[in-house]
């Protein structure tokens, strides 16, 4: 309050709210500024207006948030198969971001966070599903490898480094990072080495699970500022992880055996029934019956399993699914190579038998969809090396003989018949 106004007040002159005109005696509090006054009632009214506007903005965001059906439809464009996993993810992600909107309301019901566990073999699409979700929702996204994490104080990455990576993805915008998605891969590799708690320190197994617990559940993580390293005198960025969606995934090799041990009560000795591979059925069918107790027996600590209420199992990809992956998604490998060759002014054709041969090879290697690019890179290496220096090539044709290594890719030259690249050999 200025000296004149203080004198006015001291001399007994009444002061009035500049907004509603009420005197200082009609309100509980009158706040003074430079040449202006505002009463507590007007402050409360302003707060109500701001709160209503924030709720309207939240509703507008809700309109933009894709519905579960729309989320699944977009996932279908990039990921082949895995329908049940897509449905589970679509519902979980939709509910997570609806939960963020609910924070602005005065409702007493607080919605809990539902982090997600993805279980599926290598190359089944776990990482791609998480990446596609983040791109669809336009939120910061980062991938962390659980095998590189150790407890604080040991050589390796602290769990806080995950949040630092997320901050880097959004130029250290803390508000934006607090609504991001984190995917932690290879989570099965930090399982406890034995079913019973160990008396020795397990810095990359149970210790990391303990360190991840608070981060996943929700805590205030202290992260060094941009480009900084941790030291005692440094000011840290405070990131609230309560609203960050954590998706963790792993292959969980051997989990199917743990599930079968629980579900199949066979006899002992000569009366025991030994089932063939065909009778056991596909591993993915067994994994779909996973229960929290199976994950605990596998080596995840009970508290960690409890922080992952949504569990989605992915199926092992068969040959037909791998062929679809090669051709159908928006960013299918055959389309990517088509674009690369188009930049050289050349068309590339993958025959049907070539696609089947690539899928069969990936099945043999047990690498899933991840192995498809490796196979095509090996097959096309020499062609991609020579093509920029070769003139008059209009088309490259790949058949099953090329994939099996029995022939080199066929080159079609302008105004000529098929000529094998190896014709001069």
Swiss-Prot record:
Residue stretches making up the ClpX-type ZB domain: 5-58
Similarity-based family: Belongs to the ClpX chaperone family.
CDD domains: RecA-like_ClpX
PROSITE patterns: CLPX_ZB (PS51902)
Gene3D superfamilies: 1.10.8.60, ClpX chaperone, C4-type zinc finger domain, P-loop containing nucleotide triphosphate hydrolases
Pfam families in the record: AAA_2, ClpB_D2-small, zf-C4_ClpX
MF GO annotations: ATP binding; ATP hydrolysis activity; ATP-dependent protein folding chaperone; protein dimerization activity; unfolded protein binding; zinc ion binding
Gene that this sequence comes from: clpX
Cited SUPFAM superfamilies: Glucocorticoid receptor-like (DNA-binding domain), P-loop containing nucleoside triphosphate hydrolases
Organism, scientific name: Thioalkalivibrio sulfidiphilus (strain HL-EbGR7)
InterPro entries: AAA+_ATPase, ATP-dep_Clp_protease_ClpX, ATPase_AAA_core, Clp_ATPase_C, Clp_protease_ATP-bd_su_ClpX, ClpX_bact, P-loop_NTPase, Znf_CppX_C4
GO cellular component: HslUV protease complex
Protein name: ATP-dependent Clp protease ATP-binding subunit ClpX
Residues the entry annotates as binding ATP: 121-128
Subunit details: Component of the ClpX-ClpP complex. Forms a hexameric ring that, in the presence of ATP, binds to fourteen ClpP subunits assembled into a disk-like structure with a central cavity, resembling the structure of eukaryotic proteasomes.
Keywords recorded for this protein, A-Z: ATP-binding, Chaperone, Metal-binding, Nucleotide-binding, Zinc
Function in brief: ATP-dependent specificity component of the Clp protease. It directs the protease to specific substrates. Can perform chaperone functions in the absence of ClpP.
Chain positions recorded as Zn(2+) binding sites: 17, 20, 39, 42
Any single biological process term in GO: proteolysis involved in protein catabolic process
Top-level division of the source organism's lineage: Bacteria
């Amino acid at each position: 309050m200025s000296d004149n106004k203080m004198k006015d007040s001291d001399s007994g002159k009444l002061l009035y709210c500049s907004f509603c005109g009420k005197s200082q005696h009609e309100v509980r509090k009158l706040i003074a500024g430079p040449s202006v006054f505002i009463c507590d009632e007007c402050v409360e009214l302003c707060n109500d207006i701001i709160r209503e506007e924030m709720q309207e903005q939240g509703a507008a965001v809700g309109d933009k948030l894709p519905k579960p059906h729309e989320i699944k439809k977009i996932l279908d464009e990039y990921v082949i198969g895995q329908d049940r996993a897509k449905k589970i993810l679509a519902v979980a992600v939709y509910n997570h971001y609806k939960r963020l909107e609910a924070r602005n309301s005065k409702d007493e019901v607080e919605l809990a966070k539902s982090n997600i566990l993805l279980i599926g073999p290598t190359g089944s699409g776990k990482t791609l599903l998480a990446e596609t979700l983040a791109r669809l929702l336009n939120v910061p996204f980062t991938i962390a490898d659980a095998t590189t994490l150790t407890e604080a104080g040991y050589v390796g990455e602290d769990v806080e480094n995950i949040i630092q990576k997320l901050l880097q993805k959004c130029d250290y915008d803390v508000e934006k990072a607090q609504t991001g998605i984190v995917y932690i891969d290879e989570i099965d590799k930090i399982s406890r080495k034995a079913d019973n708690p160990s008396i020795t320190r397990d810095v990359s197994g149970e210790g990391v699970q303990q360190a991840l617990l608070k981060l996943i559940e929700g805590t205030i993580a202290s992260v060094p500022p941009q480009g900084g390293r941790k030291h005692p005198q440094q000011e840290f960025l405070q990131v609230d992880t309560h609203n960050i969606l954590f998706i963790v995934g792993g292959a969980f090799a051997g989990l199917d055996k743990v599930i079968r041990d629980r579900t199949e009560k066979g006899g002992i000795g000569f009366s025991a029934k030994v089932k063939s591979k065909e009778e056991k059925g596909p591993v993915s069918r067994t994994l779909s019956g996973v229960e929290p107790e199976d994950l605990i027996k596998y080596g995840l600590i009970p508290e960690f399993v409890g922080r992952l209420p949504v569990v989605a199992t992915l199926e092992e990809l068969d040959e037909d699914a791998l062929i679809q992956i090669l051709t159908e998604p928006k960013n299918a490998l055959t389309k990517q190579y088509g674009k690369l060759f188009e930049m050289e002014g050349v068309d590339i054709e993958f025959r049907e038998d070539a696609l089947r041969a690539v899928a069969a090879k990936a099945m043999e290697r047990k690498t899933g969809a991840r192995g498809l690019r490796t196979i095509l890179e090996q097959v096309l290496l020499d062609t991609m090396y020579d093509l920029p220096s070769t003139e008059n090539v209009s088309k490259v044709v790949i058949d099953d003989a090329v994939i099996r290594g029995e022939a080199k890719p066929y080159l079609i030259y302008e105004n000529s018949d098929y000529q094998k690249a190896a014709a001069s050999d």
